[in-house]
Amino acid sequence: MPKYRSAITTHGRNMAGARALWRATGMTDADFGKPIIAVVNSFTQFVPGHVHLRDLGKLVAEQIEAAGGVAKEFNTIAVDDGIAMGHGGMLYSLPSRELIADSVEYMVNAHCADAMVCISNCDKITPGMLMASLRLNIPVIFVSGGPMEAGKTKLSDQIIKLDLVDAMIQGADPKVSDSQSDQVERSACPTCGSCSGMFTANSMNCLTEALGLSQPGNGSLLATHADRKQLFLNAGKRIVELTKRYYEQDDESALPRNIASKAAFENAMTLDIAMGGSTNTVLHLLAAAQEAEIDFTMSDIDKLSRKVPQLCKVAPSTQKYHMEDVHRAGGVIGILGELDRAGLLNRDVKNVLGLTLPQTLEQYDIIVTQDDAVKNMFRAGPAGIRTTQAFSQDCRWDTLDDDRSNGCIRSLEHAYSKDGGLAVLYGNFAENGCIVKTAGVDDSILKFTGPAKVYESQDDAVEAILGGKVVAGDVVVIRYEGPKGGPGMQEMLYPTSFLKSMGLGKACALITDGRFSGGTSGLSIGHVSPEAASGGSIGLIEDGDLIAIDIPNRGIQLQVSDAELAARREAQEARGDKAWTPKNRERQVSFALRAYASLATSADKGAVRDKSKLGG
């Protein structure tokens, strides 16, 4: 029978000092036999997805204490990728994931907490907390802040839905008037919550639900809706039950590594492909799997991508649907229900509620459930009122979207595409693979060949795009922006958005060893591995080289002879200490980022730290 981890700080005369300090936090004699549960919050006023979380830790804590636990809250950092985008701040985004994971480990292990409730929401916070949870392997429940309502405005006598990406594209489009750009900017992000499309934050919160580590509805229920409060209340109660099951009944099924098993990872990736999630999710699932000591690789993702259809299409892949529409159609469980009926899921998995997948679908899939309360929860909709307050409205859709022929979520028979929303490509400069969000690629450019325009920084590429130096038919290559080369593997949302602003969204491709925002769409291929800074062949591409992209056949090829590539590699190696570094880039980075770069692996490994360099 495992002992409560916290007992080492609360029992025994030699722990009098620790107990004295616990008493100073408000604990009493009656608390010293109870489980101590960390409430891992991520409130910050910098990030709209986290601005409403200040009081939500208290909600969870009250339920923990009412159920017989002791709650202790702390905060992690949270970087807003949208605000950090397009300048040096983006260098810090991905490294913040490791910092979050480490800080959770530090706090939880330093104070010997027995379990956790993780209150996350945005891009690197959910992955960082997920990595920490699987590393620590103590009972955990995730409950996120929830999605933002979609922006809405009237343009050309028509009400359209908007998000952050629309504001970026219109702001850079010289054909758009100042007044229209201002109108879109003011309408794009109307409430608290994670950006309203299937960008990285919402994708990861959906995947956490599919992994079984959060409750049904967590991935799609709006941040502003009153129904979301119940998820926080339930999390506080349930974590005490899970904790006691493990420590008092020796039930290891309560542990995250047993819930988020390899079968669950496969289900989560299947969901990701079916819903056309952010390409960043590949990076984060690979990283989380390593923390869980699960053998889940790019090869597994490639195999799944070849058999899973696209059953859901959401912004940025379409302007018609946002997360509020996914929720109305049944949310994550709605998509999982269709995948299950198609025979594409592992059914022998459980979630934090203790329900198997069939039990979860029976209770929460709007197509089959008889539970009116569940149907009512999925009718929770937007209010259209600007606010930074959680749970501030209780509007509901008149009806559910259960149309699996033409609705937001489709059945296998009516899939948006027989090919899924993500694909892994391989070729002579992506030997370990690269990722494309096929959900956002127009059918006309699934096969594309063009001359390379090579840039060794995102900034140079942006300048060239906006300066008219990139023309229809070009393949923009941005390299030395990988985990090590950036460092930090910047997102390329500005270059892809500016291609659209210049009318080149369907006329050019963009390839990088960096990554893309979940808001990116178009022929945007990222995570090229190995990256240039690790000696990857993307570092050998020259201006004018033809690059052939073949998404249907999962190929990407630099049309240069092996002999020529060998000669270029020899010339690169001859640069000595300067080999595999940018020739024409001046970028000063901090010691913290250099430390990150010294241990960073390429994207095919999840951009995690190289344990072999530390003897592990």
UniProtKB/Swiss-Prot annotation:
The modification N6-carboxylysine is found at K124. Signal peptide: none annotated. It catalyses: (2R)-2,3-dihydroxy-3-methylbutanoate = 3-methyl-2-oxobutanoate + H2O; (2R,3R)-2,3-dihydroxy-3-methylpentanoate = (S)-3-methyl-2-oxopentanoate + H2O. Binds 1 [2Fe-2S] cluster per subunit. This cluster acts as a Lewis acid cofactor. The active site is at S517 (proton acceptor). Its cofactor is [2Fe-2S] cluster; Mg(2+). Pathway: Amino-acid biosynthesis; L-isoleucine biosynthesis; L-isoleucine from 2-oxobutanoate: step 3/4; Amino-acid biosynthesis; L-valine biosynthesis; L-valine from pyruvate: step 3/4. HAMAP family: IlvD. This is Dihydroxy-acid dehydratase. The gene is ilvD.
